[in-house]
Regions:
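Charged, low-complexity terminal tails
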Residues: 1-100, 122
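Flexible glycine-/small-residue-rich
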Residues: 14, 107-111, 119-121, 133, ...
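Phosphate-interacting basic helix/loop segments used at nucleotide- and nucleic-acid interfaces
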Residues: 95-103, 204-208, 296-301, 350
Length: 473
């Protein structure tokens, strides 16, 4: 009986324990589901909060951007007002510094970077105006530029007046002048446009040169002459003709080692807004000759950079070479006549600068060279320059002694590539003339041709007359 009771009790206990465990498991599952739901709810809350935070951030960023833009706009407005006030202040400062006087002259840049505006004959003087290195760098200014600007009020300690601001460079706006090409970077080509020297009532010499030895834009011509053959008169006539036929062309007559009365005569005879006479008389130092010639060359280069046509009439390249021969340090080598080879470098650079530019603009140089002066040096200088030009006009002393003017030796005168300058009709007549006159003496040739020129009013009539006379033969 006891054993059965115990068994029943054990079975009940086992049943209770199984139920208990089942309940426990059910409770565990319920707890797990509750936790899952709580986690889901928390995740949803977290997501909602994150979205709210993001929305708040976006809203705050947009508001910040708007605030920043407003601040920037305010700053810009403030800056513009400040700049305007500063500009007005600067203008007031500049206007207070402005002396009211204008500077107008050629710039010479020194090796140290600063420069001076030279006013008279391209040389230093009391009225020169100082130009600061910052102005030279800003506008790409070079030696030879013509500057126009306002002068600052001069203080007691200052030796020279100073340039306050630049108004124009070579007649152009300063920033336009800064963009120009360098002279050395331009492309040289043969002269292909003729400079007509024939005018109404023109002297016979100009008509003869125009036909027998034509001059083109960019010509590098040499007038070879013995003393007292009329070279200075010929240069004067050429300058007059160019100013008459080409009023827009810049003509610079450079007189080196010349007589003072000749300078006055040429200055009074050549008129025109684009004509200049620059001189250094024989009583000046060689340094003076050198400086004047270099300034004239730089002036011409600056004009060519602006695509302008320039003519330099130099009298004479022989005297310029003599001046450099006195200034050049001895190289230890000497040519016949006591000429140092190094002395020819700068005169050759001057003469070689003549060229016609493909990009536009031209520099024409006509230089006189002296021969048979009794000085061996002069003959050596001429021989050195003989092959460098592309046009030669030879004057003959025998003709001048017979008082046959112009004393041009037709057989020895001529232009290279004259086919680019003459018409076919003119070219045929010139060639026929040379053939006809080849066996005669220079004075006989000149007398015959002068008779033909005197019988006609212009070169067109001369060509027709020559055609008729040559056809008869």
């Amino acid at each position: 009986g006891i054993s059965t009771l115990k068994k029943e009790q054990l079975v009940e206990k086992l049943m209770k324990s199984e139920k208990y465990e089942e309940k426990r498991e059910e409770k565990k599952e319920e707890n797990i589901e509750v936790k899952r739901e709580e986690n889901r709810k928390e995740n949803k809350r977290a997501n909602k909060e994150e979205k709210r935070k993001e929305h708040r951030k976006e809203h705050t960023e947009e508001s910040k951007k708007e605030n920043r833009e407003e601040e920037k706009a305010e700053e810009k407005a403030g800056d513009t007002e400040e700049k305007k006030s500063e500009a007005e202040g600067k203008k007031n400062d500049i206007s207070s510094l402005d002396s009211g006087n204008m500077a107008n002259g050629i710039l010479e840049v020194m090796p140290d970077g600063y420069g001076f505006i030279r006013c008279e004959n391209y040389l230093p003087g009391e009225n020169d105006v100082y130009v600061s290195p910052s102005q030279i760098r800003r506008f790409n200014l070079k030696t030879g530029d013509i500057l126009v600007g306002n002068i600052r009020i001069k203080t007691q300690n200052e030796k020279y007046s100073a340039l306050l601001y630049v108004q124009s460079v070579n007649g152009y706006k300063p920033f336009d002048a800064a963009k120009r090409k360098n002279f050395e970077d331009l492309t040289p080509i043969f002269p292909n446009e003729r400079i007509n020297l024939e005018t109404e009532n023109a002297p016979l010499s100009m008509r003869m040169v125009d036909l027998l030895s034509p001059i083109g834009k960019g010509q590098r011509g040499m007038i070879v002459s013995q003393p007292k053959t009329g070279k200075t008169t010929l240069l004067k006539q050429i300058a007059r003709s160019i100013t008459a036929t080409r009023p827009n062309m810049k003509v610079i007559v450079l007189l080196i080692d010349e007589r003072p009365e000749e300078v006055t005569d040429i200055r009074e005879s050549i008129e025109g807004p684009n004509a200049e006479v620059i001189y250094s008389t024989f009583d000046e130092l060689p340094e003076h000759h050198k400086r004047v010639s270099e300034m004239v060359l730089e002036r011409a280069k600056r004009l060519v950079e602006h695509k302008q046509d320039v003519v330099i009439l130099l009298d004479s390249i022989t005297r310029l070479a003599r001046a450099y021969n006195l200034l050049v340090p001895p190289s230890g080598r000497t040519l016949s006549g006591g000429l140092d080879p190094a002395a020819l470098y700068m005169p050759k650079k001057f003469f070689g600068s003549a060229r016609n530019m493909r990009e536009g603009g031209s520099l024409t140089i006509l230089a006189t060279a002296l021969v048979e002066t009794g000085s061996k040096m002069d003959d050596v200088v001429f021989e050195e320059f003989k092959g460098t030009g592309n046009m030669e006009l030879v004057l003959d002393r025998k003709l001048a002694e017979k008082r046959i003017f112009p004393a041009i030796n037709i057989q020895r005168s001529g232009t290279r590539r004259e086919d680019l300058l003459l018409t076919k009709e003119e070219q045929e007549i010139v060639y026929a003339l040379h053939r006809e006159l080849s066996g005669n003496r220079a004075d006989e040739n000149m007398e015959q041709i002068l008779n033909f020129f005197k019988r006609t009013k212009n070169n067109k009539e001369f060509i027709q007359l020559m055609k008729q006379s040559l056809l008869k033969k």
